[in-house]
């Protein structure tokens, strides 16, 4: 028995049970809103304890990062292997206004790309956008068979791989530094940068499965409420965003 403990005083009345309080009665639900860059702006809901005294619920919500499948944001299963990170920057009533925080591939997609008899090329670069966001962009590519090739393997020489990697870094720096974060998001959805790398490296070595596999946000500028509201539209109540074009059109020949 513990020293100084009186069993008679600590014993409660028989038959009385402790009142069970549902913890959800002290919590509020908030709607997560994605930027208008994505077609579906309703990401989901999250909860937090209500504001009590000096503790404000909005302070606990700002900075939260949510990972969402791009297929849910775009309404297309073609993007199911990519994950988007959204960060809460502002609370408006029951709506959480988010901004782009990063991009990543699912592990099963990355494993499905790696095969034998081909060379893997990876490149990454740290670059600042036009609106002062510092990002680290990772690209991945694989060599493919050349036209009229008989040999089974498509391994590239180290010198060729260095040239391809240099070209990949050059294109990523150019494409990211000349646009804002919102414009970059519009490029990442239809994979404009990957197609540009594949097109530009044809003269060095033909590539396939060229993707921007990861984007990490390293540093962000001072928070600007005006730019965030512009990113979400004036009222920020629309459920649909604008559709991002793929950037190319099929050409139909009149005569063959």
Curated annotation (Swiss-Prot):
It is found in: Cytoplasm. One of its GO terms (molecular function) is structural constituent of ribosome. PROSITE patterns: RIBOSOMAL_S3AE. Pfam families: Ribosomal_S3Ae (PF01015). InterPro entries: Ribosomal_eS1, Ribosomal_eS1_CS, Ribosomal_eS1_euk. One of its GO terms (biological process) is translation. Keywords: Acetylation, Cytoplasm, Ribonucleoprotein, Ribosomal protein. It comes from the Eukaryota. The modification N-acetylalanine is found at residue 2. Its main location: cytoplasm. HAMAP family: Ribosomal_eS1_euk. Component of the small ribosomal subunit. Mature ribosomes consist of a small (40S) and a large (60S) subunit. The 40S subunit contains about 33 different proteins and 1 molecule of RNA (18S). The 60S subunit contains about 49 different proteins and 3 molecules of RNA (25S, 5.8S and 5S). Belongs to the eukaryotic ribosomal protein eS1 family. This is Small ribosomal subunit protein eS1. It comes from Candida tropicalis (strain ATCC MYA-3404 / T1). The lineage of its organism: Eukaryota, Fungi, Dikarya, Ascomycota, Saccharomycotina.
């Amino acid at each position: 028995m513990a020293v100084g403990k009186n069993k008679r005083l600590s014993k409660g009345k028989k038959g009385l049970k402790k009142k069970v309080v549902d913890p959800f009665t002290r919590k509020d639900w908030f709607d997560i809103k994605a930027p208008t860059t994505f077609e579906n702006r309703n990401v989901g809901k999250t909860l937090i304890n209500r504001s009590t005294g000096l503790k404000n619920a909005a302070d606990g919500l700002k900075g939260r990062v949510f990972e969402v499948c791009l297929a849910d944001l775009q309404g297309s299963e073609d993007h199911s292997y990519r994950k988007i990170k959204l960060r809460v920057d502002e609370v408006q009533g029951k709506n959480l206004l988010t901004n782009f925080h990063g991009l990543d591939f699912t592990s099963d997609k990355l494993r499905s790309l790696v095969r034998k008899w081909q060379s893997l090329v990876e490149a990454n670069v740290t670059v600042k956008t036009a609106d002062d966001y510092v990002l680290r962009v990772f690209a991945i590519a694989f060599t493919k068979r050349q036209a009229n090739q008989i040999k089974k393997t498509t391994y590239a020489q180290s010198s060729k791989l260095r040239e391809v990697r240099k070209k990949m870094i050059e294109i990523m720096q150019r494409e990211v530094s000349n646009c804002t974060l919102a414009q970059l998001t519009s490029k990442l959805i239809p994979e404009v940068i990957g197609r540009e790398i594949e097109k530009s490296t044809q003269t060095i070595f033909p590539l396939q499965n060229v993707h921007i596999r990861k984007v990490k946000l390293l540093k962000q500028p001072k928070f600007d409420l005006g730019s965030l509201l512009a990113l979400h539209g004036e009222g920020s109540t629309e459920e649909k965003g604008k559709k991002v074009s793929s950037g190319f059109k099929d050409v139909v020949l009149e005569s063959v």
